[in-house]
């Protein structure tokens, strides 16, 4: 009977879960020097109609706001039921406009069950049940829908659903919510043949905000996005973007903002007119406050591509593998009988075959590619297809940076422009590089790719909590959470950031407010997130920016993870130093000391003295 109840709870969640505006809620992150309002449909920042909202205030309680509104974008290329190739960009409901059909928002909406229905607030780790304080605001749900499958403690009632595991509160503040694109009925497309009421692309997005008041992370607000393809169709081409409305200098001083990017550190940032980037001096805020700092948004973890055969993030340099050269981009000719590499695009498995005497046909999704013998072929960038039949996908990807209007600098992404040394790849003819676990590493493969799982600390079982005696605890091998709704053990797959072959920052577009892309223009948004295009040719104006990472495929039932840091600095060196520091912290799975919990203190007044007591 218990087993039947567990199955009912679990499957009822899967069947009935869908986003709705009725589940909208908000809260405020204020766990370090940054304070900002956020909403559980993806908006970070403020609505002008909500006077209590705060948009990226730094330092906390200063009244100095740098961010108006921020939203994440997820673009997908697909074929509709009429066979037409379409682009969908799923957006957040926000003050810059939204895609609406009468009163229905065609975009992200929150799932029910992740907040306390008796409050209008998003669940946060420090706002749980507190029986000692009747006025305390309790934001947690009675149980968590995504942990209903835990056989020992279904739904984790009374426990925090933490990134690090059950009731693990590593951060000063952690928020958690889940949303989907169920209501996005814009296109003639049905992502789930078993549920024709579901629209959109069949995407579900779980989001966490994290803050530490540790000195190394006190100027950073972390945002983690887990985007899962819950449809029964593969999505062959996707891109993830972030659109940022800046008000550097505060309200009334946003008309003279500047913005730039740093490709090496995967960061985009804004600053006030007159600011000297080295010293941070010169900028003046709306009410005369000075200096005005720099606000940055950075990829700490960008989308990964574990299928292209390339070490996208450059972490495989000490292992086996040849390096990419420009000679690989030259046209090639295959005669009948020559060995070529073909890819099964449903699994991305490679096979060596002899080129046929007549023609070679390869299918990818709804596309059919036909190759003839003795005809020149060459790689086509950014189509996520192996055009030259060597098993490597898009090895000739490039980037074009518009330095000033009409003036561009071009370079290849996978070859260092100064040294000429390329990234490593797998040679599918010889097998060289196939044993390098950091080429095409993945957080979905059940493998400790970087070898950092520690049996003395990490063998805590599937729920991530030591002492619960759950599956995998103290069994001497890493236990991955892949294929479950549970986190798994530290330093493997879900809980190990380094196990992702990250693409990094692939585009940046700085545009005047009012003439930039609208949230209901899918094609324009898709075009502005074109990988390889970097534009910051306008400055000293009221402008916003859009940056992105792509392209990558997302197979059905798989999850792609992203992490964005909102961070601040007194000047550009300070901002980049903060980025590099928190990148190290992130790569080490936030492994740094957390401040001790504050004790409860009470006093007893005597004759001419006061005695203080506190708990331990």
In which residue ranges do the predicted regions lie?
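Extracellular/surface-associated beta-sandwich interaction domains
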Residues: 17-616
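Bacterial Sec-dependent N-terminal signal peptides
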Residues: 1-21
């Amino acid at each position: 009977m218990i087993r039947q109840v567990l199955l009912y709870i679990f499957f009822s969640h899967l069947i009935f879960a869908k986003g709705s505006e009725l589940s909208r809620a908000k809260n405020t992150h204020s766990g370090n020097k940054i304070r900002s309002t956020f909403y559980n449909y993806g908006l970070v920042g403020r609505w002008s109609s909500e006077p209590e909202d705060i948009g990226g205030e730094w330092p906390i309680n200063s009244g100095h706001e740098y961010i108006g509104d921020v939203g994440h974008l997820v673009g997908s290329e697909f074929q509709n039921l009429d066979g037409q190739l379409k682009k969908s960009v799923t957006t957040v409901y926000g003050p810059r406009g939204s895609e609406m059909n009468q009163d229905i928002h065609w975009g992200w909406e929150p799932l029910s069950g992740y907040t306390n229905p008796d409050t209008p607030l998003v669940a946060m780790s420090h706002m749980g049940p507190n029986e000692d304080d009747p006025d305390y605001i309790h934001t947690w749900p009675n149980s968590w829908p995504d942990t209903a499958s835990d056989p020992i403690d279904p739904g984790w009632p009374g426990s925090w659903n933490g990134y690090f595991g059950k009731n693990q509160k590593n951060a000063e503040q952690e928020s958690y919510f889940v949303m989907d694109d169920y209501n996005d009925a814009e296109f003639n497309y049905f992502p789930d043949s078993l549920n024709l009421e579901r629209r959109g692309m069949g995407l579900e997005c779980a989001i966490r905000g994290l803050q530490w008041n540790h000195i190394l992370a006190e100027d950073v607000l972390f945002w983690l996005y887990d985007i899962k393809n819950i449809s029964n169709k593969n999505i062959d081409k996707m891109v993830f973007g972030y659109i940022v409305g800046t008000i550097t200098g505060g309200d009334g001083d946003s008309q003279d903002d500047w913005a730039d990017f740093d490709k090496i550190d995967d960061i985009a940032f804004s600053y006030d007119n007159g600011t000297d980037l080295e010293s941070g001096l010169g900028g003046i805020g709306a009410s005369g406050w000075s200096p005005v700092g720099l606000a940055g948004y950075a990829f700490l973890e960008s989308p990964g591509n574990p299928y292209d055969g390339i070490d996208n993030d450059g972490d495989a340099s000490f292992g086996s593998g040849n390096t990419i050269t420009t000679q690989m981009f030259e046209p090639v000719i295959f005669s009948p009988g020559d060995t070529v590499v073909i890819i099964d695009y449903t699994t991305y498995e490679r096979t060596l075959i002899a080129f046929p005497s007549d023609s070679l046909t390869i299918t990818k999704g709804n596309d059919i590619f036909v190759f003839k013998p003795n005809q020149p072929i060459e790689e086509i960038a950014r189509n996520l297809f192996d055009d030259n039949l060597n098993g490597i996908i898009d090895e000739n990807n490039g980037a074009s940076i518009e330095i000033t209007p009409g003036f561009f600098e071009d370079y290849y992404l996978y070859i260092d422009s100064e040294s000429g040394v390329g990234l490593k790849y797998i040679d599918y003819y010889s097998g060289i590089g196939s044993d390098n676990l950091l080429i095409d590493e993945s957080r979905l493969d059940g493998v400790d790719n970087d070898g950092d799982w520690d049996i003395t600390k990490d063998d805590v079982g599937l729920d991530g909590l030591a002492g619960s005696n759950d599956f995998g605890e103290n069994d001497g091998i890493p236990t991955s959470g892949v294929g479950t709704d549970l986190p798994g053990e530290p330093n493997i797959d879900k809980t190990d950031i380094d196990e992702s072959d990250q693409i990094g920052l692939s585009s940046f577009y700085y545009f005047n407010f009012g003439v930039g892309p609208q949230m209901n223009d899918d094609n324009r948004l898709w075009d502005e997130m074109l990988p390889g295009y970097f534009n910051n040719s306008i400055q000293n104006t009221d402008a916003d920016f859009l940056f992105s990472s792509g392209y990558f495929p997302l197979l059905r039932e798989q999850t792609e993870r992203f992490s964005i840091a909102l961070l601040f600095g007194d000047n550009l060196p300070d901002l980049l130093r903060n980025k590099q520091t928190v990148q190290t912290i992130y790569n080490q799975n936030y492994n740094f000391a957390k401040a001790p919990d504050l004790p409860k203190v009470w006093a007893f007044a005597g004759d001419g003295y006061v005695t203080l007591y506190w708990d331990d």
